């Protein structure tokens, strides 16, 4: 894995981002490419077309399956997510997404749902406002100097997201925190590379 974080060459970042789909495919996880395409392309459009942005229970379950496919599968959390009341998911995510662009309030609100922590909550926010919220991933966080050991807390996410927003601003040219996160994740090789 190269030291992408410390590179100031936009081409290095672009190359890493362009490898994202290939790295997704090389994970060897059933349905991950399809889930990732849905998460990146279909879910953001569905959220954007709603009068009041929110996710449904079915979308939250599918998003959780995407997150676990790309990272670590936690069956208990998925059971908890599936057990949420459908109306509560819509109400909670509607309230949360109305708090954008606050750096952490939407994450905190979404994390009130059963089985949802800052990482899953950040996936909802990232699908809604990729210019503000990156998805919270430990393989990405490990590449950002100064963050320390990954802690699945709102405070840690706040520092992580701020660092990725700052890097996106430095890269300019339309880069978002989500682009930075995906480039760093691709640079890591994903969980398949970390398991070696």
Where is each model-derived feature located?
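C-terminal accessory module of base-excision DNA glycosylases/AP lyases that mediates lesion recognition
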Residues: 1-63, 132-196
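Short, well-structured hydrophobic secondary-structure segments
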Residues: 49-89
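A short glycine-/small-residue-rich loop at the edge of a beta-strand within enzyme catalytic domains
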Residues: 54, 97, 101, 131
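Helix-hairpin-helix/helix-loop-helix acidic hairpins
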Residues: 72-116
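Generic helix-packing signal
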Residues: 100, 125-126, 172
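Catalytic DNA-binding helix-loop module of base-excision-repair DNA glycosylases/AP lyases
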Residues: 105-146
């Amino acid at each position: 894995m190269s030291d992408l974080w410390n590179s100031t060459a936009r081409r290095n970042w672009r190359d890493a981002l362009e490898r994202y789909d290939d790295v997704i495919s090389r994970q060897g996880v059933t349905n991950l490419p399809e889930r990732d395409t849905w998460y990146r392309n279909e879910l953001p459009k569905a959220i954007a077309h709603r009068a009041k942005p929110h996710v449904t229970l079915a979308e939250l379950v599918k998003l959780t399956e995407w997150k676990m496919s790309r990272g670590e599968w936690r069956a208990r959390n998925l059971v908890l997510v599936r057990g949420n009341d459908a109306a509560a998911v819509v109400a909670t995510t509607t309230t949360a997404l109305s708090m954008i662009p606050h750096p952490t309030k939407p994450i905190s609100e979404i994390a009130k749902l059963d089985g949802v922590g800052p990482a899953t909550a950040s996936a909802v926010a990232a699908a809604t406002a990729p210019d503000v919220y990156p998805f919270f991933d430990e393989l990405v966080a490990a590449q950002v100097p100064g963050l320390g050991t990954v802690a699945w807390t709102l405070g840690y996410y706040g520092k992580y997201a701020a660092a990725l927003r700052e890097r996106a601003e430095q890269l300019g040219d339309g880069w978002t925190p989500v682009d930075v996160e995906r480039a760093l994740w691709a640079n890591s090789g994903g969980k398949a590379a970390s398991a070696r």
